């Protein structure tokens, strides 16, 4: 069984280091770098989810997904699409229906923030704006 840790939009894969060191499964776990999955592409939710799904589908064993914020949305989406592949979910700050107005406000604020505020995450400023814009219509409530 493989444990996959997914960070949020404002973090990076290193955000899970303390967690993986504290667990007994660190040898069979991976902290995924979401920015790397869409590197060289327009950072849309569908591009990110597609890359994430391909990576999960390539695993030869069941997976346990642990996601924070954006990572939890990806994990939830994958578990809905591939329920037999996902053994368990740990979702932190998950949204099953995106708060569209809040995402629009957040994007408006992103426009005024300097590029340097985004760099340590691996995503650029335009990536943040694009991801949030393309997530606004997500709704897993059905």
Predicted regions and their residues:
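Short beta-strand immediately N-terminal to the catalytic nucleophile in serine-hydrolase-like folds
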Residues: 65-67, 92
């Amino acid at each position: 069984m493989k444990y996959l840790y997914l960070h949020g939009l404002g973090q990076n894969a290193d955000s899970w280091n303390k967690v993986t060191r504290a667990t007994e499964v660190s040898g069979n776990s991976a902290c995924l770098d979401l920015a790397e999955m869409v590197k060289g592409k327009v950072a849309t939710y569908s591009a990110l989810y597609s890359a994430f799904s391909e990576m999960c589908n390539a695993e030869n064993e069941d997976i346990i997904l642990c996601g924070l914020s954006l990572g939890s949305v990806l994990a939830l989406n994958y578990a809905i699409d591939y329920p037999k592949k996902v053994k368990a979910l740990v979702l932190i700050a998950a949204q099953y229906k995106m708060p569209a107005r809040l995402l629009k406000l957040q994007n408006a604020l992103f426009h005024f923030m300097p590029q340097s505020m985004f760099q340590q995450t691996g995503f650029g400023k335009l990536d943040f704006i694009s991801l949030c814009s393309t997530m606004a219509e997500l709704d897993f409530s059905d």
